[in-house]
Amino acid sequence: MKKLKINYLFIGILTLLLAAALWPSIPWFGKTENHIAAIQARGVLRVSTIDSPLTYSVINGKKYGLDYELAQQFANYLGVKLKVTVRQNISQLFDDLDNGNADLLAAGLVYDSARVKNYQPGPMYYSVSQQLVYRVGQYRPRSLATVNENQLTIAPGHVVVNDLQRLKETKFPDLSWKVDDKKGSTTLLEEVISGKLDYTIADSVAISLFQRVHPELAVALDVTDEQPVTWFSRLDDDNTLSAALLDFFNSINEDGSLARIEEKYLGHGDDFDYVDTRSFLRAVDNVLPELEPLFKKYAKEIDWRLLAAISYQESHWDPLATSSTGVRGLMMLTKNTAQSLGLTDRTDAEQSISGGARYLEDMMAKVPETVPEDERIWFALAAYNMGYAHMLDARSLTVKTKGNPDSWTDVKQRLPLLSQKPYYSKLTYGYARGHEAYAYVENIRKYQISLVGYLQEKEKQEAEAMKLAQDYPAVSPEELNKTPFPLLSFLSQSSGYLTHSPSLLFTPQKKEEK
């Protein structure tokens, strides 16, 4: 998979052009009636988005998402509350702008020449490419020349339709596709996984995140080059909202908060390993249930799923794991560390998890207070892996090379240098396997993303199954076996977890309400 590129030079040029266009209207309150005045009078910033791990999602009652966090900061910047409306597809998002039901669209939408004819783009803050995906084990197209409408389905309003039309006119005259007006990109990705669809197209970041939970999804080819991502608002003579957005993005770029949010959601890397991810998810099904109560019990200061991800990276959840250097157990503790924590048996699952959690808490407590709260864990994990002293060296090296020692984005880039003599020879604590610490933290982040998404998916499907049980009467085994897709066959699909709504497979008459 192509690596994600945040092309700040390109984004900067586009932002400058936007600034030039907006310059006459920078004084926000120069008019008696403008968008900013209306938003502040209302006291609410209305943002429409799409439910996805990157843009906006709700997990255990808490809201997450790159676009959500940026929108919340922008609302704070304006001194108003944030109201988020979730839509099913991109067409519905732009309907909200057209109908006056939204002030902004914040949903990972790409800048496109056709869109900017009718809508006002904001500053560009990262970039993606559009990719055609298929299911592992099925035919992989090597070119769009062989793709037709019986195979390729696109979500309504998807910007790639314009690119496909240009490609059809210039390179692939037989290229064809269909648009499903009722489904969003996430649903179409799920249908590719289930085998209901052959292909669809989505952006590279969304695909990368989706693969952490659904490793059967594979990239066949890139349909476009990198495209900048932006927010959209209404296009009219009043540019006060666009001017405010430009000022806001400039401020969070200067104070580093934009980089921190991007690191949180985009900084885990996108080197996808199908075999490793599939093995991990199998372990989640087969091994984690026995250990889950212990992770929940001892993960006091951190998310238990992160503690579980650390343990998987350390030992693949094998309580008897032993390395060539003598570290042992689920959390791979050294003998000295175990003794300092009062542990008597490193191969005892409960002792190992409790000891590892306490040791990580010690590392967290040592991280300088100048490090932002949401990045402290990554510094602590690097220290957990290579020692706290070497983490201090990494911060020192970051300063010497004109980086920010409190930014995980900057520090992690220097970690591999700790094993190179021109650098470690000038550091206080000398040589360290910094490249291993870098990979260690990145792998844990990937496992955590997979685990959170996978468990959320299972909870969603369990809720659907419960609703199904309430809506339909019991189905006898004889009736069930008459269906083309028996329940047991359905439940065995996709590595033991559901990939689409159970309601698709049932046709019995719904119970009448009494």
Swiss-Prot record:
Name the residues annotated as catalytic in the UniProt entry.
Answer: E314
Q: Which GO terms describe its molecular function?
A: peptidoglycan lytic transglycosylase activity
Q: What Gene3D superfamilies is this protein classified in? A: 1.10.530.10, Periplasmic binding protein-like II (3.40.190.10)
Ranges for region Non-LT domain: 31-269
GO cellular component term of the entry, any: cell outer membrane
**Enzyme category, top tier:** lyase
The protein's UniProt keywords, in alphabetical order, are:
Cell outer membrane, Cell wall biogenesis/degradation, Lyase, Membrane, Signal
Give one Pfam family: SLT
Q: Which InterPro entries match?
A: Lysozyme-like_dom_sf, MltF, Solute-binding_3/MltF_N, Transglyc_AS, Transglycosylase_SLT_dom_1
Location of region: LT domain: 270-514
**Catalyzed chemical reaction(s):** Exolytic cleavage of the (1->4)-beta-glycosidic linkage between N-acetylmuramic acid (MurNAc) and N-acetylglucosamine (GlcNAc) residues in peptidoglycan, from either the reducing or the non-reducing ends of the peptidoglycan chains, with concomitant formation of a 1,6-anhydrobond in the MurNAc residue
Task: Provide the protein's localization.
Answer: Cell outer membrane
Chief site of localization: membrane
Instruction: Give the EC number(s) under which this enzyme is classified.
Output: 4.2.2.n1
What does this protein's UniProt record list under function?
Answer: Murein-degrading enzyme that degrades murein glycan strands and insoluble, high-molecular weight murein sacculi, with the concomitant formation of a 1,6-anhydromuramoyl product. Lytic transglycosylases (LTs) play an integral role in the metabolism of the peptidoglycan (PG) sacculus. Their lytic action creates space within the PG sacculus to allow for its expansion as well as for the insertion of various structures such as secretion systems and flagella.
What the entry says about domains is: The N-terminal domain does not have lytic activity and probably modulates enzymatic activity. The C-terminal domain is the catalytic active domain.
Name under which the protein is recorded: Membrane-bound lytic murein transglycosylase F
Source species: Salmonella choleraesuis (strain SC-B67)
Q: What lineage, starting at the top, does this entry show?
A: Bacteria, Pseudomonadati, Pseudomonadota, Gammaproteobacteria, Enterobacterales
